[in-house]
């Protein structure tokens, strides 16, 4: 830990307060974040927790040392949506093979997309299908302890039975009673449930569906419920390698430091995770600190396919910055668009709702262009240590105050403090050394062009277009092309308004 490191403080959803972070073991800081269900392209709402907790991962590594931090983010590869996609996309294949194709291709795309957003790989990415043994063992323990029961080849968890015992109470995270949660929840009504709030730990597989040997003496094949998957995977990757798990009676060894995810997961998913893990492992807490990022809207509206504003990460990388055009290496183009998307998201505090707009994305790309231009001009090299990132680190140590961190970067740019700018960008995952050192990056061919003059001529052309004076509009376009500046017209996908971008050609 750096001697001058500020005190890290994080908002804990469990206590509803900002707390000084005190790891269970400073030489083994552990964090779990709920990851993707791999059945379709990830959307920009999925990108937000990936970026938020990547920044926290980087900060923890900066404060405690990279070798002392373990970050687990799961991959859910058992789900009804996966089954439906497999049946739709590969009707002629055996079902298990179709499922494998869906999960492998979708996961590969997810990994490529989030890498383009500037994220580090987590330490481990457990897949649900690799941890069936742990799930069955946890379920057996819960049945033995009287908080789960078998009914019609299902195993269900009973929140009422949990609350009848000594120890943590169901609803502590959401801060609602069972009656309040029942009133506000969409719960499956099934005859085999003892109580409406009981939730599935294991269920029988339907004919043709993937299935595994069942726990609790059930003879038919089955598959896990969603919530038990995360309890089992976090135990397998953050507890068992370090002496915890079902064979350990030490409550401290059966807790980890931080659990993260989107605000939509507080109930029922995270509430159910806590119930399962605490009852199975005999702890008061599953994780000491629970962190949740806020919702995302698109151009002021809820993102949905019905509104036509559903945007995937791949959409942003391919089309979010149309001025990029086609590069010789579109992987590099994706990385630039990904950094712009990352900066755009980090301009809103992680706990606040975010409004995704095409304008902010474009503005973020322009700001990155200025920052990288300074780094290129001054010959900045990839830093081995972040000894000049103290202002950014101090901001992030205040509950990941990314806006204050970006303000520090802007100040460093203003005074041309290249070390503080570059190292601060690195700490936030905004520094890609390629864009500092490469000589053939198309966007930096703009450096010798008068951007303000071009913007004025584009505005003049737009006035002619609005007046339907096509001849004058075409004249400006052609004159700019003769000067080596090519215009490209497109529409804002959310508003339908004309967007004109430009690039240097020839």
From Swiss-Prot:
GO terms for cellular component: cytosol. This is Cysteine--tRNA ligase. SUPFAM superfamilies: Anticodon-binding domain of a subclass of class I aminoacyl-tRNA synthetases, Nucleotidylyl transferase. Belongs to the class-I aminoacyl-tRNA synthetase family. The keyword Ligase applies. It catalyses: tRNA(Cys) + L-cysteine + ATP = L-cysteinyl-tRNA(Cys) + AMP + diphosphate. Binds 1 zinc ion per subunit. The keyword DNA-binding does not apply. Its cofactor is Zn(2+). It is found in: Cytoplasm. It comes from Brucella suis (strain ATCC 23445 / NCTC 10510). Zn(2+) binds at residues 34, 230, 269, 273.
């Amino acid at each position: 830990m750096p001697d001058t490191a500020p005190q890290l403080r994080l908002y804990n959803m469990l206590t509803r307060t900002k707390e000084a972070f005190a790891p269970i073991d400073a030489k083994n800081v552990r964090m779990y974040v709920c990851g993707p269900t791999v059945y379709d392209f990830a959307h920009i709402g999925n990108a937000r927790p990936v970026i938020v907790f990547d920044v926290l991962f980087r900060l923890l590594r900066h404060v405690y040392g990279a070798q002392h931090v373990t970050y687990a983010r799961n991959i859910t590869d058992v789900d009804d949506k996966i089954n439906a996609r497999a049946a739709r996309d590969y009707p002629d294949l055996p079902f298990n093979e179709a499922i494998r194709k869906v999960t492998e291709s979708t996961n590969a795309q997810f990994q490529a997309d989030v890498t383009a957003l500037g994220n580090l790989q987590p330490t481990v990415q457990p897949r649900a299908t690799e941890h069936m043994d742990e799930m069955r063992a946890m379920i057996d323990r819960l049945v033995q302890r009287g908080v789960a029961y078998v009914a019609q080849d299902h195993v269900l968890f009973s929140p009422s039975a949990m609350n009848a015992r000594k120890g943590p109470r169901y609803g502590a995270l959401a801060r609602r009673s069972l009656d309040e949660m029942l009133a506000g929840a969409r719960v499956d009504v099934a005859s085999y449930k003892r109580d409406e709030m009981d939730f599935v730990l294991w269920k029988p597989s339907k004919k043709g569906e993937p299935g595994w040997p069942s726990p609790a003496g059930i003879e038919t094949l089955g598959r896990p419920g969603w919530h038990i998957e995360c309890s089992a995977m976090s135990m397998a990757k953050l507890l068992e390698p370090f002496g915890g798990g079902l064979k350990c009676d030490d409550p401290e060894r059966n807790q980890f430091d931080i659990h993260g995810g989107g605000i939509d997961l507080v109930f029922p998913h995270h509430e159910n995770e806590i119930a399962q893990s605490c009852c199975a492992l005999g702890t008061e807490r599953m994780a000491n600190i629970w962190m949740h990022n806020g919702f995302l809207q698109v151009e002021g509206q809820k993102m949905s396919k019905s509104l036509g504003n559903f945007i995937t990460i791949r959409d942003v990388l391919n089309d979010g910055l149309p001025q990029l055009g086609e590069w010789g290496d579109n992987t590099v183009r994706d990385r630039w668009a990904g950094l712009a998307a990352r900066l755009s998201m980090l301009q809103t505090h992680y706990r606040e709702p975010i409004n995704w707009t095409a304008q902010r994305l474009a503005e973020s790309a322009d700001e990155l262009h200025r920052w990288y231009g300074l780094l290129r001009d001054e010959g900045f090299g990839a830093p081995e240590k972040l000894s000049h990132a103290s202002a950014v680190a101090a901001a992030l140590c205040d509950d990941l105050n990314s806006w204050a961190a970006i303000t520090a970067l802007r100040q460093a740019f203003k005074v041309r403090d290249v070390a503080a700018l570059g190292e601060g960008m690195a700490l936030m995952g905004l520094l890609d050394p390629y864009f500092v050192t490469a000589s053939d990056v198309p966007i930096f061919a703009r450096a010798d062009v008068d951007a303000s003059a071009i913007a004025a001529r584009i505005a003049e052309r737009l006035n002619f277009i609005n007046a339907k004076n096509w001849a004058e509009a075409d004249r400006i376009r052609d004159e700019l092309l003769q000067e080596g500046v090519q215009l490209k017209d497109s529409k804002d996908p959310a508003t339908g308004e004309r967007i004109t971008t430009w690039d240097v050609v020839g």
